[in-house]
Regions:
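Short proline/glycine-enriched turn/loop segments at secondary-structure junctions
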Residues: 159-163
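Active-site region of the double-stranded beta-helix
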Residues: 38, 69-75, 84-94, 102
Length: 177
């Protein structure tokens, strides 16, 4: 829809403060290291929000596509830790994940500069349809403070939020050293 609302805010533009402490929590990074089996560093720390009544869509994508093309991340040995700042409900634009899609590897993506205010490397409908046929779609929900971890190649997206309930999620992106 091309709205001009803020959809994502990185820690570099937020300054420090208590929220930045989450990014250096050894327990979180340690859990990621256990999952990927190697030492990790924090590549990115951001808050993605979907405002009440105005939260926009996130097209189907893999985060690694953006990290590779925009950040020049050399390999796909990366993951996200998502921490819910608001309750994530089936109705307020939860993440929709395609289970096991990370096993398809780094998929061909196109740079979408027009759909929303955030340029994103997105997947075509045929690719998403095949992956969904194989793995289905899940939309994890949870209370504020809930956590979700997923590989950078996991295909995901989310619908808009037209409810009175905001949905904010902190993301720690961890990458192999």
């Amino acid at each position: 829809t091309g709205s001009n609302q803020v959809r994502s805010k990185s820690v570099a533009s937020m300054g420090g403060g208590p929220v930045a402490l989450v990014g250096v929590t050894a327990r979180m990074i340690g859990t990621g290291e256990d999952l990927l089996g190697e030492k990790l560093y924090m590549h990115q720390f951001k808050i993605n929000g979907k405002r009440a009544f105005q939260g926009d869509v996130w097209q189907w994508h893999q985060d690694y596509g953006t990290w590779k093309n925009d950040d020049l991340m050399p390999t796909e040995r990366a993951m996200n830790i998502a921490i819910f700042l608001d309750e994530v409900m089936p109705i307020n634009g939860p993440l929709m994940l395609v289970p096991k899609s990370q096993h398809a590897g780094d998929l061909k993506a196109s740079h979408d500069l027009e759909t929303t205010s955030y340029p994103l490397w997105t997947l075509d409908e045929a690719t998403v349809t095949k992956l969904v046929k194989d793995g289905g779609i899940v939309a994890p929900t949870g209370k504020a403070g809930g956590m979700l971890m997923f590989h950078g190649n996991l295909v995901h997206g989310s619908a808009g939020n037209i409810t009175p309930y905001p949905r904010k999620i902190v993301y720690l992106t961890l990458n192999a050293v």
